[in-house]
Structures are given as structure tokens and as C-alpha cells.
Amino acid sequence: MPIYNFSAGPAVLPQPVITQIQAELPSFRDSGMSILEISHRSDLFAQVLQDAEQDLRDLMAIPDNYHVLFFQGGGTLQFTAAPLNLAPHHRIGLLDSGHWAQRAADEAKRVGTKVTILGSSAANHFNQLPTVVQPIDQSLDYIHLTTNNTIEGTMMTRLPVTGQVPLVADMSSNFLGEPYQVSDFGLIFAGAQKNLGPAGLTIVIVRDDLIGQVANLPSMLDYQLFAAKDSMFNTPPVFAIYAAGLVLKWLKAQGGLSTMTARNHAKAALLYDFLDQSQLFTNPVKTSDRSTMNVPFVTGQADLDAAVIQGAREHGLLNLKGHRLVGGMRASLYNAMPLAGVQALVDYLAAFEAHHR
């Protein structure tokens, strides 16, 4: 029986990547040393780091005036790093699209930043994206948004018009799964553990003219320092960068982001089409704002939801339990999830519904 992992993160990885890791783990590139034990100062790792950055630049068409930095601490650490580095006047705007946007606001406030909510969909239970209040104050240091809301199941493809105010994007859950123009943003960050690799790595893409505005920052949060040190200020997450590098090469071999985006839209359409015609399952998200990465759905009865999850597990469909804040079910359809996995889920849900009419 095939196993399909619908976890929201850490999440499914491409099988060829796992196979390659398994083969190379005892001796990386015939060095006699595992990737788990090589020095981060070695030529072996220098090549891994260089390749990962270049492959990411190729896939996303990252302009030369943007730095690519490799951090630890998850996307959550960037909720603090972004205002420390990019908000010299301690004033930012934020689009409140759900849990992770609110977490970003809370962390910014902890470091003395005033956060102005420019739009919120809280009144709609975050089942749609917020409408931006215009005009936007041009004295704001930046505007924070979340491109994909993992818990609520919404995704932003149309960006707000912000004038000269830079956009800062938390792309953690649709990074490399939906195409964006990097030059539309001042800063992009993303935890790797959804679409890029195992947990332990965070990607930061930041425009050169925005760093160095604030002096005497904590070293581990200083974008300018990390840029100057090529992300090697301290020991980086060697294995996580190596694994992410393999995923990037896999993405290129698949045809890049255009191919992956088409696949992701096809997978999401398959599941949404079933949910929309179902008499048992519902998805609460406004159709135009639906995520291609994270699809929440419910039966409306907690005991029936539990039965769905248990039965799915018995059919090799794992980690469908919804986030603890919203309950129900959630299917995460990241890049490495094959169409066959989504078809298996739809077939199971259809059979479950037929049995429980």
C-alpha cells in the first residue's frame, strides 16, 4: 500500500531526493565522510552552499541586487529579524490574514515596533484575504504580508499596491510552489520544512539597499553581517542546506517553477472540485482566495472528522488532522505530493461519504 504524507510541515520530500540522501549518507562525494560530519569550512560544503544559492537564484530569477541568506530559527525568528533590520523608524504596516500574521505582529511589538493593521479578515474568520485600506502611509518602514496561510487555507496571488513602501513576505508555506516576482518585494523569507527540505533551515532573500540601516544588532539576527559572511558567521545547518540543495536540483529537473505551479494547480483543483460537489465535506474558504498548498475541510461533526482521519490513516493517507486552532482536516499538497496521492485521497473521501450517507 502506498503511503502519502499530507503533513503541513515538516512535509513530504521528493522520493528521488530521499533515495539520494540514503545513498550518499555514509560517504559524501566519495570523501569517506558523511554529510553529517563534514566541516562547514571544507571545500565540499562550500560547493554545496554555492550550488544551493545559484540554483535558487536560477529558479526564482533573483536579481543581482538581492542577497540570498541561509538562516536557522525558522520563519518565526524572522518575525523579529525583519523589524530589527528593516524598520529604523519602528513603524510597519501589516495585513492580518490569520494566525501567522498575528504572530509576526506580536514579535514586532516585542522589539518596540509600532504595528498598523492595514486590513484584516478576522471578521470573516480568516476564510478570505483582507482588503487593504488605502491610501497607505508612505512613512511606514515596510508592510508585512503572508502569501499563504497554512492554517486558514488562503493564498495571496495579487499583491497590494504600496507605493514606495517595501513589501516583506512570509512565504514559508508556498515558497517555490507559486511564482512571484522577487523584485516586487524588499524581503522574502521562508522556513524550508514545507516545500524545500527538512526543518532547520530558513531562506532569506533581501534587497541590498534595505540592509545596514540599523547598527549594533544581535549578530545572529543581522542581515548585513550574514551577507558579509556569506551565511557563514557561525556554523550553518549543513545537512539541511545539503538536502535543500538536492530539492532545488530536483525542481530544476522537473522543469522549474512553471511546471511545478501547473502541477500544484491541477492537484488543488482535483481536491476542490470534489469538495465543492460533496454533500458531506465542505471547504470554508472564499473560492478566489483558496490556497493550492493547504486545503482545510470539515464534515461539521467532530466525531465524524475523527473517523475520517482514522480511516485515512488505515488507507495510507497520513497527517490529515487539521490544526488544533480550527480542527477538522487539512490536506497539504506541497510540490513533492504526487497527483496520485491527491487522487487516492479523493477516492477515499468519496468512499467514506458513500458509506455515511
From Swiss-Prot:
Record-listed L-glutamate binding positions: 41
Cofactor binding note: Binds 1 pyridoxal phosphate per subunit.
Record's subunit section: Homodimer.
PTM sites of type N6-(pyridoxal phosphate)lysine: 194
Gene Ontology biological-process annotations: L-serine biosynthetic process; pyridoxine biosynthetic process
Name used for this protein in its record: Phosphoserine aminotransferase
Keywords: Amino-acid biosynthesis, Aminotransferase, Cytoplasm, Pyridoxal phosphate, Pyridoxine biosynthesis, Serine biosynthesis, Transferase
Enzyme Commission number: 2.6.1.52
Subcellular location: Cytoplasm
Source organism per UniProt: Lactiplantibacillus plantarum (strain ATCC BAA-793 / NCIMB 8826 / WCFS1) (Lactobacillus plantarum)
Any one GO molecular-function label of the UniProt entry: pyridoxal phosphate binding
Gene that this sequence comes from: serC
Cytoplasm is among the record's keywords: yes
Cofactor(s) it depends on: pyridoxal 5'-phosphate
One CC-aspect GO term: cytoplasm
Annotated positions binding pyridoxal 5'-phosphate: 75-76, 100, 150, 170, 193, 234-235
Keyword Manganese appears in the UniProt entry: no
Classification via Gene3D superfamilies: Aspartate Aminotransferase, domain 1, Type I PLP-dependent aspartate aminotransferase-like (Major domain)
Pathway(s) of this molecule: Amino-acid biosynthesis; L-serine biosynthesis; L-serine from 3-phospho-D-glycerate: step 2/3
UniProt similarity note: Belongs to the class-V pyridoxal-phosphate-dependent aminotransferase family. SerC subfamily.
PANTHER family assigned: PHOSPHOSERINE AMINOTRANSFERASE
Catalytic reaction equation(s): O-phospho-L-serine + 2-oxoglutarate = 3-phosphooxypyruvate + L-glutamate; 4-(phosphooxy)-L-threonine + 2-oxoglutarate = (R)-3-hydroxy-2-oxo-4-phosphooxybutanoate + L-glutamate
Physiological role: Catalyzes the reversible conversion of 3-phosphohydroxypyruvate to phosphoserine and of 3-hydroxy-2-oxo-4-phosphonooxybutanoate to phosphohydroxythreonine.
